[in-house]
Regions:
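Charged alpha-helical initiation segments
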Residues: 1-85
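Short non-catalytic regulatory patches outside canonical folded cores
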Residues: 43-44, 73-122
């Protein structure tokens, strides 16, 4: 086994909590009151969609290569894991890009000096 029993318990707890945290974050962005239609598009159909794909990729990665896997994974498992990791990284980048565009398109969002209106912490 590659991980200790304590580490496996930590992985399980983190994975078990992932769906709830994902749903909470997605709901916050879908319900975010934005005045710009473009910002709303980036929040709901960009960020939220990519977040769903990211959640799916991470979930599938844990199914293909569970932390408690005994022995060496076969080539198919490694290929699937590689694809899911690459997919996750693409969607992390896409999420960041969508958030950047949301902040550019939504009027009234100011710099870090917090002068003027800003989005509430999500």
């Amino acid at each position: 086994m590659y991980f200790t029993a304590q580490q496996l318990d930590e992985f399980k707890a983190a994975r078990d909590g992932l769906s709830g945290r994902y749903r909470t974050l997605m709901e916050k962005y879908i319900m975010l009151p934005l005045s710009s239609p473009e910002a709303t598009e980036y929040a709901r159909h960009g960020f939220a969609r990519r977040l769903a794909s990211l959640h799916h990729a991470v979930d599938r990665l844990f199914e293909v290569l569970p932390p408690d896997l005994e022995g060496i994974p076969n080539k198919a498992q490694l290929a699937d894991a590689s694809a899911f990791i690459q997919n996750a990284l693409v969607h992390v980048y896409g999420c960041l890009d969508n958030l950047a565009w949301l902040w550019v398109k939504e009027p009234g969002i100011k710099k870090a000096n917090r002068r003027g209106p800003t989005l509430q912490a999500i």
